[in-house]
A protein has these predicted regions:
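Catalytic cores of soluble metabolic enzymes centered on carboxylation/carboxyl-transfer
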Residues: 2-131
Length: 131
């Protein structure tokens, strides 16, 4: 039962201990340079895995990506004990992800994980326009 719904107070925010960091990359069926849609048939699919790695997706080998809908084909999520480790884990996990037959934003996300501004936590919403 939710204690707050019973009228109990929440503990103060200061009592919450942060434990690690998660990163999510939204993999889309798009050209990684122009972000134009890339519909077509997936000829090969290798889903990464491992401790604290999660891939939420509906795709599979021989699946056809239609041109009519949202191009997102998966969410790749990793967790590790700190930001630098999470970035490294995401890069390695992205390199293990194989989606053949269509263009995807996988390589864009790999480049982001290697980008020194991103690694140094020095980025903003204008990142793509400066790319």
């Amino acid at each position: 039962m939710i204690k707050v719904a019973q009228g109990e107070a929440l503990p103060p925010q200061e009592s919450i201990t942060l434990k690690g960091l998660a990163i999510e990359c939204r993999i889309t069926a798009e050209d990684p340079n122009t972000f134009t849609p890339s519909p077509g048939k997936i000829t090969k699919y290798v889903c990464p895995g491992g401790r604290n790695v999660r891939m939420d997706s509906h795709i599979y080998q021989d699946y056809s990506i239609p041109p009519y809908y949202d191009s997102m084909i998966g969410k790749l999520i990793v967790w590790d004990t700190d930001r630098n480790r999470a970035i490294h884990k995401m890069k390695v996990t992205l390199e293990q992800l194989i989606i053949g037959g269509i263009k995807t934003t996988r390589d864009f996300h790999i480049a982001m994980m290697e980008n020194q501004d991103f690694i140094n936590n020095n980025y903003d919403t204008n990142y793509l326009s400066r790319r």
